[in-house]
Design a protein with these regions (language model features):
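Surface loops and adjacent helix of pleckstrin homology
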Residues: 9, 15-17, 81, 143
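Extracellular jelly-roll beta-sandwich "head" domains, especially the C-terminal globular C1q domain
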Residues: 22-174
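Extracellular beta-strand solenoids
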Residues: 1, 5-6, 12-14, 20
Length: 174
C-alpha cells in the first residue's frame, strides 16, 4: 500500500481499507470505585469518594478530589451506580444521586423515594449524556435521607458478597 496525503478541504471517497481515522474516542474514558464504606451526613449532599481508578488511559480522573476533567470538547455518557445502607431495617427514606458540572450545576439527577415503605438499603443507578467543553470537570454526588442516622455508601455488597457494589465512570460518545 501507498500512503496518500489528503489536503485540507478535500473530500475522501474510499473503496479500500481505511486506517488511522477516528480521533480520541477510544481513549477518552474512565471508571473508578470506592474501596471502603463512606458515611454521609443525613439529608446532605456529599461527593462520592471514588478513590480507586479502574480505567483511565488519559489520566484525567483525580483520585484525590474524585473529579474527572474532560480532555476534549464533546458529548459524554456518564454513569453512577451504588448502594446506600441505613444499618437498620425501616430507616432509609430516600436517596438522590447527581452529577455536578464545574462544582455547581447539577447536570443529571436521579431519586429513589422509600417514604411509604421505608427500607434498609437502596441500590441506585444514574446515567445520561452531558455536552462538555475541554477542561470542564464532573463529580458524582449523593444525598441520602435516613430516619435516625447517617447512611453509608457501601464499598461492597450489603448482602456480604465480595466485590465492588459501586462505580462511577464515563466516556466520550461524540
Amino acid at each position: 500500500g501507498d500512503t496518500i496525503n489528503i489536503p485540507a478541504g478535500a473530500t475522501i471517497a474510499n473503496a479500500g481499507t481505511a486506517t488511522g481515522f477516528g480521533g480520541t474516542f477510544g481513549s477518552t474514558y474512565f471508571a473508578a470505585n470506592m474501596t471502603s464504606d463512606e458515611t454521609f451526613t443525613n439529608a446532605t449532599y456529599g461527593k462520592l469518594g471514588m478513590n480507586n481508578e479502574l480505567a483511565d488511559p488519559g489520566s484525567n480522573y483525580d483520585t484525590s478530589n474524585y473529579r474527572y476533567t474532560v480532555p476534549s470538547t464533546g458529548i459524554y455518557f456518564f454513569y453512577i451506580m451504588g448502594n446506600f445502607d441505613s444499618g437498620s431495617n425501616g430507616e432509609l427514606k430516600s436517596v438522590l444521586m447527581a452529577i455536578k458540572k464545574n462544582g455547581s450545576t447539577y447536570e443529571l439527577e436521579s431519586n429513589i423515594n422509600l417514604n411509604t415503605g421505608l427500607g434498609r438499603n437502596a441500590g441506585m443507578t444514574l446515567n445520561g449524556v452531558i455536552s462538555l467543553s475541554a477542561s470542564d470537570y464532573v463529580e458524582a454526588w449523593a444525598n441520602p435521607n435516613d430516619n435516625s442516622g447517617n447512611p453509608t455508601f457501601k464499598a461492597n455488597s450489603v448482602f456480604g458478597a465480595a466485590g465492588s457494589a459501586n462505580q462511577w465512570g464515563g466516556w466520550r460518545i461524540a
